[in-house]
């Protein structure tokens, strides 16, 4: 059940913005002398968890009142509030293009002095650095939870047939053929919802393309056509093992079909598991890394910062904000989130992961992960729709057309950013 919001619409937020400013804005003190710290976080599915965190924190802290809002359309609400200069103290968002834009707009505080960063896995801190449009000194977010994407599979069916986890592209294709020969459906897709086209695309690209490819393109060092051909061809190749007309079925349809045993595998992220389990609570799910290369040593887990916390640059109560972050990073609080959301912790520690991540555990523990390529794509470019169009195109030159369009559209939607990056490189010729 979603939390009953204190302010349920952007209009309501705007109506109260003036009053909030009158109360001296970010981190306003209350009549009882407490400092109020407000968090706005973007995952409404975790609202109940954050309600509990808020209650636990406030029951154990006499000098700080914590308010956590989990609105349904948090990014729109946050952007509206930023325009009105009505800032929360802390925001909880994903490590994606929105984070890059907020950072580029100088909205976030450098928290390099926050001691809690010492407990965060370097891999996820490095992922945030790759989201910077140009290199910046400092640290601007605390990675909290990651997710993982590859291939979910029905463990019971695998065990029944004696199938083993593929570690190369050829082994994956051979497995799919074995599944078909057994009269079963290898994959199910919900490509009617265009965003789901990014799931296999991202999982394949982390093996075959540089993690900083978008930055390389912005610097004029390469093109997508030079790097994405194999990614595109292998994403298309998965259709050979999909159900008939995967573009007629939605994400919900695919989750339901997999839950009911209509397919043995589902190329999607760990975020799909709760919905699958709603349909079939008894399904025995595990997962494995997408083996897009024929060199098993090159396999990388597709994992990014699903939730991270940034202190706003104008927060007046940095010490209290850090105290809230300390509470969020307590082992008990972290484990509670893992249990609630089947997440991957960005914090070092001996945490118990969901069983459906067993097949990815070694990659998580070794930090052998790479971020989602689409975290660098501007939303207005609609890469998901471009991929869907490509997958529907059965012409001989479909891949060439797609790759040419990708490069053209990238320049169209990133013209100002490309100019900024290249100006920076001219001013800093020694920066790699």
Q: For the regions a protein language model found, what residue spans apply to each?
A:
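A structural signal for short loop-to-beta-strand junctions that line the ligand-binding cleft
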Residues: 80-81, 88-89, 118-156, 185-189, ...
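Extracytoplasmic "Venus flytrap"/periplasmic binding protein-like
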Residues: 56, 60-124, 156, 160-161, ...
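Glycine-centered hinge/linker elements that transmit conformational signals in sensory
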Residues: 178, 217-247
